[in-house]
Amino acid sequence: MPTSTRTKTKSPVTPESIKDLVLLGSPALSPDGSRVAFVHKKIGSKNNYVTNIWMMDSDRGAPVQFTNGSRDGAPAWSPDGHWLAFVSSREQRSPQVYVMPSTGGEARALTDLPEGAITQLKWSPNGTQVAFSFREQADDLTREATRRRKEAGGTTPPLVTEDVFYRLDGDGYFGERRFKLHVASIEDGGHRMVYGKDTMGFFDYDWAPDGRRIVLATNRNKQPLKNPDRTELLVLDVQTGKTTVIPNMPRGTKGRPVFSPNGRWIAYAGRTGKDSSYSTDNLELWLCDSKTGKARCLSGDTDWCLLAATLSDTSEASFEPWIAWSGNDQILARIGWHGEAHVVRFDRQGKKKPRRLTLGRVVLGPGNLSADGKRIVTTLDQPTAPPELHVGRISATSISLKKRTSFNDQFVKTHTIAKPTMNWVRSADGTRVQTWVLKPPTSRGKRHPGIIEVHGGPHAQYGCTFFHEFQVLANAGYVVAYSNPRGSKGYGRDFCAAIRGCWGTVDWEDIHAVSLWLQSKEYVQTKKIGIMGGSYGGYMTNWAIGSTDMFTAAISDRCVSNMVSMGGNSDFPFEPDRYWEGNCWDRPEALWKSSPIRLMGQARTPTLVIHSEGDLRCNIEQGEQIFSALKIQNVPARFVRYPRETSHGMSRNGPPDMRLHRLDEILNWWKRWFKGKSSR
């Protein structure tokens, strides 16, 4: 008889384990609430990501694969539920809009667009058209142009621009091309551009219930980086192309406009005031009359922010707000709070206080509602399991969520998963800093080296998400502490604004306090504490090694080191006297004061510097400055430079082999300085 293969032995979470994870996203609920379409993403056999659309019933049954392409995404239901539109790059073509019967069958290419990028796919309410945002690739950068140059032995041409916004991290170089709004006919696929005046191409839109109009949140100012508060709400007549500005709107940034079912109201996310872009102020929920523009803030009495921005490497941190109507009188929005992300109900008339409809130490992703606003589908993330899809019914007081997928259950069952404990640590001035600790899951009663992880942003949050990197470190025998120092989202406006224009002050006090707290724990080896982080987390790592010798070693990943040079070479250049006082050319004092590079004369901590050649957010010269400063002073340092096809987000969505290499470098560095012989 065959022997049982069941065993109680579980495997540790390793860098290679990322290949076993299934990532889920873009859930779309059918109009009647009976079915769910979603994107299934997994690492493929050719060092790639394979993304398909899957389908399942809302209440029962297993999900099934719905599309066969390897790069399918953005599913959108037709209003009658008979069709599914999606974006695909199949058959070696550039991305196109496809439609397919929702019962299955052959997908039909609805568009024949030139090479470019497609986002924001939405059906018209009458089901005769789909709208989408499209940006055409610059002529010299298309695949065909590249092929012809290669055959002719030509050189890659220079990029010439007169616009300061000509590139975007993770998106590459696009020169002066911008996203524009298009509509396509479902009957014959004919498509046309209906709006193209947003200066940066960052508009949001929604169809009016009558199917003839579209509302756009758009900035047409000639200097949008300098004037982000000039965002308007426009109503576009789709047939004639005529636009009408909704009058009397408060000045400030606006985004994610959503018509009420009766078309009378528009809910949107916004901030008021001139300085309302990269802001520490809360992003609020606003409501306006669609004709008169009379507006009021519905979330002003709370200290919530509509930017949940909870970080993870197994789900995309959403820096965009999510807003939806549930009937004509109730609005749902997602807020981040204390490391969690929840759905909140707001009353249109403002007579009832906002009410949180979901509970638990979880992070809910952007949801999608049925046509009647009574059902919702969303991803649910928690610290001990990767995100899965949940479907729920919405009542006046709560949302009852039911787990509907189990793609990662086997992974959780067969691997040793570290479970975090949550703590509040007192900083030097008494401020409480929320902190989580992961201990090695299979080694109890022993002391272990400790690692401080610092998040990026800085205006984001760590929290109740599954973090593969953290699990790898805990399974390798390290205690991992991750916290939300001042500057983080999720703790109110004042907490977030505490480091506005003054990084390296109270934020460092908080990180230092957490480090000392971890060092004092009975399960940590007192003299073996490390620090690491990416982006702003890399900044704080640099600041730490320039401020103290308490850390055994450090890892500075995709860092910021010099605010003066960063102000001019990032994809979003710093505007003078906005977030930072002064500027980066003739009044750099505040920027220099907050630059860790000026502290490197005191640094003695062995440091691994990780950076990507294609990082357009924090240019690779930021990492170069730290590495050079350390090596010139004979401080042990190692520099890992990833190729140009990687970007600032490599640890989350970079080429799989590069992600594995990065994690191996991290493990080897900690092993070298924690467990090996060092000269220190």
Language-model segments: residues:
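Predominantly five- to eight-bladed beta-propeller fold
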Residues: P2-T7, T51, R135-E187, N227-E232, ...
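Beta-strand-rich domains and repeat architectures in extracellular enzymes and scaffolds
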Residues: E16-T51, E176
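Conserved beta-propeller blade repeats
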Residues: L21-V36, G69-V87, A107, P114-V130, ...
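Short, solvent-exposed loop/turn segments at conserved positions within beta-propeller repeat blades
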Residues: K46-V50, R90-P95, L141, G172-R178, ...
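Short loop/turn segments that connect beta-strands within beta-propeller blades
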Residues: D57-G61, P101-G105, S185-G189, D237-G241, ...
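Beta-propeller fold detector
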Residues: V64-T67, R108-T111, R192-Y195, T244-P247, ...
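Cap/lid segment of the alpha/beta-hydrolase catalytic domain
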Residues: N221-K222, T405-K527, G534, M566-F574, ...
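Active-site-proximal cap/loop segments of hydrolase catalytic domains
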Residues: Y482-R680
